[in-house]
Amino acid sequence: KDRPRWMAQNAQAFFATHLGNQVSSELIAWTVQRCLDCSAKAAVEVVETGFSTDLRKEAGALQVPTLILHGDADASAPLHLTGRRLAQLVPDNVYKEYPGAGHGIFLTHTEQLNQDLHDFIEGSSS
């Protein structure tokens, strides 16, 4: 009924601000607006595809260096159902959990994420 309100209410969980992640009201508003800019049908299809597509076989067949980063406070993709399971499936991966990080890890833990990406790329290219 009220998609903008639902998005705004769930933004706090997306960023895990209840755990002390500092996110400006402007960044929250911008993120909510980005979500609202896509059609409701597209948003539903993305969620539906994520819940109904089984990629376990493909994950187990990966033969490239793989970095898996996941927040331990991700309400959208709970750690025990997603990140940890993926790490068990993908051979020879580098797996890191970010304490206190929600689904918006790329915005709340930017420096750590960028450093981990850099380290992974440097280590994978040698």
Positions of the model-derived regions?
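Residue-level signal for the nucleotide or nucleotide-sugar donor/cofactor binding architecture
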Residues: C38, A77, T108
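Conserved alpha/beta-hydrolase catalytic His-Asp/Glu region
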Residues: R3-G60
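Conserved loop-alpha-helix segment in the C-terminal half of the alpha/beta-hydrolase fold
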Residues: A61-A101
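A short C-terminal helix-loop "cap" of Rossmann-like NAD(P)-dependent dehydrogenase/epimerase domains
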Residues: K1, R5, P91-V94
